[in-house]
Amino acid sequence: IWGGLEALRVCTFKHNDASEQGARPMTASASGFVPGSGAGAFVLENLETALSRGARIYAEVLGGCINSGGQREQGSMTAPNSSAVKSCISKALVEAGVNSEDIDLINAHLTATAMDATEVQNWSLALQKSGKNVPYLNSLKSHVGHALAAAGSLELVSSILELSQGFIFPNLNCDTIHPDILEIVDEEKIPRTLLKKNLTIIAKASFGFGDVNACVILKKYSDGDKSA
């Protein structure tokens, strides 16, 4: 006989009277993540097979990286090792064959905790970009909360939809951006309203529990890519 139990609770405490405002990544008033639930599903196949069966192609996976920080330096069960995060991002770019200038949007891990500013700093250092040169940043967790083991799949689906439909979803509840983040990236790169944008390449990352990191580089598919 085997059994398991997980009792989730809302980790934020400042918005009990307005629960829809509790999930607020990148804000000065963030007080912890709000658990969410759901699933994301997609079909991965090579281009030749997809074309032969007439599949609707939403995006291409150019490359990516998975690593672990080993819970060293400042890494822990719940916080990533910054050195490993930066290495994961850099290696994903190399594996995908793109430069930091090619990234239009970062669909980030950002969880509405004290580590948000550290994550933004890691992106800035890994991409060697700051201020207005940082790609747009957003976090789906402001919409659906943190779906724990399912978070990466949900957020990857959102990235694919942003690419295929040409938009950047807003960061909800982001009324006052954390001052440490504004020292790294220009405020206009943290959209708080829906933006219609013709995106080409998105970097999606998850820096999850256990100090395990993943970053994937996605490209918008077009008919001109059939010979790729």
Question: Which stretches of residues belong to each language-model region?
Answer:
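Stable alpha-helical structural segments in soluble proteins, enriched in small hydrophobic residues
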Residues: 88-96, 122, 126, 155, ...
